[in-house]
Regions:
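Short beta-strand His + acidic residue motifs that chelate non-heme Fe in jelly-roll/DSBH
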Residues: 48-49, 68-69, 85, 91-98
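A short, N-terminal "cap"/entry segment at the start of jelly-roll beta-barrel domains
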Residues: 1-33, 48, 114, 118-147
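Short acidic-glycine-tyrosine-enriched beta hairpin
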Residues: 72-87
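Glycine- and acidic-residue-biased ligand/ion/polar-headgroup-sensing regions
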Residues: 54-66
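A short hydrophobic beta-strand segment most commonly corresponding to one strand
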Residues: 38-39, 58, 84, 98-114
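Conserved short histidine dyad/triad with adjacent acidic residue
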Residues: 22, 37-52
Length: 147
């Protein structure tokens, strides 16, 4: 039975600008199937919307506040809240708050397939209608705007 010391884990950048992750439990730590990853999201950073086609995922907010982008909806979540994303459902996260947020992603398998998605008519968490935000699309709008 391994004891995994958090301070001994290496952090990975690159999941998104302003986000880094560490695998807490996985194949390298001796897990038979479970995969748990801790992700830190800096202020004004986001985890792009994605789908796990064949695997559900539980995402637990350990620290901070952020917005969960679920399908076409944006919901504010904070410490202690859990998002359960069924297989095939679109989900992403946006930290438009002052401090960093820390999330645990819990998968029942090591083979986690993730596909980044764009949903027609859905935003990345910002109003996209010209006139409401002044921008044609969310990609045109700076992250720090509209708090």
């Amino acid at each position: 039975m391994p004891i995994i010391k958090k301070q001994e884990l290496s952090k990975r950048a690159g999941i998104a600008a302003g986000a880094e992750s560490s695998i807490l439990v996985g194949l390298d730590q001796g897990s038979q199937s479970l995969h748990i990853e801790e992700v830190s999201v800096a202020p004004n950073a986001r985890i792009p919307r994605r789908i796990n086609p064949h695997t559900e995922v539980a995402i637990i907010v350990q620290e901070g506040k952020l917005d969960a982008i679920l399908g076409r909806e944006r919901v504010a979540i904070g410490q202690g809240d859990t998002v359960l994303a069924p297989a095939g459902s679109a989900h992403g996260f946006l930290n438009r708050y002052e401090g960093p947020a820390r999330l645990l992603f819990i998968f029942p398998t090591h083979q986690v397939e993730q596909v980044e998605v764009s949903i027609p008519g859905a935003t990345l968490g910002f109003p996209s209608e010209k006139g409401l935000s002044g921008y044609q699309s969310p990609e045109d709008r700076p992250l720090g705007e509209g708090r």
